[in-house]
Amino acid sequence: MAVSESQLKKMMSKYKYRDLTVRQTVNVIAMYKDLKPVLDSYVFNDGSSRELVNLTGTIPVRYRGNIYNIPICLWLLDTYPYNPPICFVKPTSSMTIKTGKHVDANGKIYLPYLHDWKHPRSELLELIQIMIVIFGEEPPVFSRPTVSASYPPYTAAGPPNTSYLPSMPSGISAYPSGYPPNPSGYPGCPYPPAGPYPATTSSQYPSQPPVTTAGPSRDGTISEDTIRASLISAVSDKLRWRMKEEMDGAQAELNALKRTEEDLKKGHQKLEEMVTRLDQEVAEVDKNIELLKKKDEELSSALEKMENQSENNDIDEVIIPTAPLYKQILNLYAEENAIEDTIFYLGEALRRGVIDLDVFLKHVRLLSRKQFQLRALMQKARKTAGLSDLY
């Protein structure tokens, strides 16, 4: 049963880059139906373990004209795709690992592509396609010889009785100086813990060729058309995803630019309104300046005229009310303030002992009565003139 994208997200819930990892895994499963995602415990060299997702199953490899299913297991670290997957060949009981420059005795796979792994240039689908090409040139497993057979055992790595690459010590690859000891943040990567591999009978490798009944060719080479087709497929898939990512990025940038353009248009409209308002205010200010200049000239002329006439003018004649009622109010106000000053100075005279208390009280009583009458009359006159109350 195929695993859905939601199930993958649940399995990879602890992955740092879950959505990206799920997307690449879905692409691989869609192209290679035999690979199934499994959540299992991976044991590192230091004995620590971690729950990781692995892709377990077979990939089709064309060797000498026939297609064989090579069992593999790809462990995806929780920092994928910034760390490469840990890849193993998973031979069945009827198979034997053929050690070489790409596979060690434990079945661990070493490839230049894994060594040079760098996101976003490297991805899982392209890795599998490169494995198919390399395993087509140098198969990582071959079938065990059977004692009861009356014919020489057939091997997937070459003709019968041909010499195989000598077994390499466990953990040693053909790239001694290039591969990092282990992915960043993880201990070493040994062979995964032993566990049952999905049922695969001995007849699956070498499998019955699904596309031809002819026996494998004996020339020991893989056709250039096959390599070219695999590389073209890998490159086209990668270009397709790169183009999609670029298109998505360009669309997001275009949307952001559109929003910025709208904001700029709104800002431009506000600035135009502000400039129009400022122009109106400047025109109003210029008008007020002209008016003030005229008034200033009038005041200067009046002051100059008054200075020339000040020597011949009496101060009492200068202040002349425009109506008799206003003149009466002015006289009443002046007289009332004079009485106020008189009462003040009488108090000062009493304090200094110039006059007696009886004299002070007598004059104050008379002045206060007079002041009251003046205030009452002035209040009535102001009311008649339409002025506000003074007291």
From Swiss-Prot:
The answer to whether UniProt assigns keyword Nucleus to this entry is: yes
SMART domains with a match to the protein in the record:
UBCc
The record ties this protein, via CDD domains, to: UEV_TSG101-like
**InterPro entries membership:** ESCRT-I_UEV_domain (IPR052070), ESCRT_assembly_dom (IPR037202), SB_dom (IPR017916), UBQ-conjugating_enzyme/RWD (IPR016135), UEV_N (IPR008883)
Quote the PTM field: Monoubiquitinated at multiple sites by LRSAM1 and by MGRN1. Ubiquitination inactivates it, possibly by regulating its shuttling between an active membrane-bound protein and an inactive soluble form. Ubiquitination by MGRN1 requires the presence of UBE2D1.
Task: List each coiled-coil range.
Answer: 238-317
Which intervals of this chain are the motif PTAP motif? Answer: 321-324
Q: Where are the annotated segments for Interaction with CEP55?
A: 159-163
Keyword annotations: Acetylation, Cell cycle, Cell division, Coiled coil, Cytoplasm, Cytoskeleton, Endosome, Growth regulation, Membrane, Nucleus, Phosphoprotein, Protein transport, Transport, Ubl conjugation
| Assembly and interaction partners | Component of the ESCRT-I complex (endosomal sorting complex required for transport I) which consists of TSG101, VPS28, a VPS37 protein (VPS37A to -D) and MVB12A or MVB12B in a 1:1:1:1 stoichiometry. Interacts with VPS37A, VPS37B and VPS37C. Interacts with DMAP1. Interacts with ubiquitin. Interacts with AATF. Interacts with stathmin and GMCL. Component of an ESCRT-I complex (endosomal sorting complex required for transport I) which consists of TSG101, VPS28, VPS37A and UBAP1 in a 1:1:1:1 stoichiometry. Interacts with HGS; the interaction mediates the association with the ESCRT-0 complex.
Q: What does this protein do?
A: Component of the ESCRT-I complex, a regulator of vesicular trafficking process. Binds to ubiquitinated cargo proteins and is required for the sorting of endocytic ubiquitinated cargos into multivesicular bodies (MVBs). Mediates the association between the ESCRT-0 and ESCRT-I complex. Required for completion of cytokinesis; the function requires CEP55. May be involved in cell growth and differentiation. Acts as a negative growth regulator. Required for the exosomal release of SDCBP, CD63 and syndecan.
Q: What is known of its domains?
A: The UEV domain is required for the interaction of the complex with ubiquitin. The coiled coil domain may interact with stathmin.
In Swiss-Prot or TrEMBL terms, this protein is called Tumor susceptibility gene 101 protein
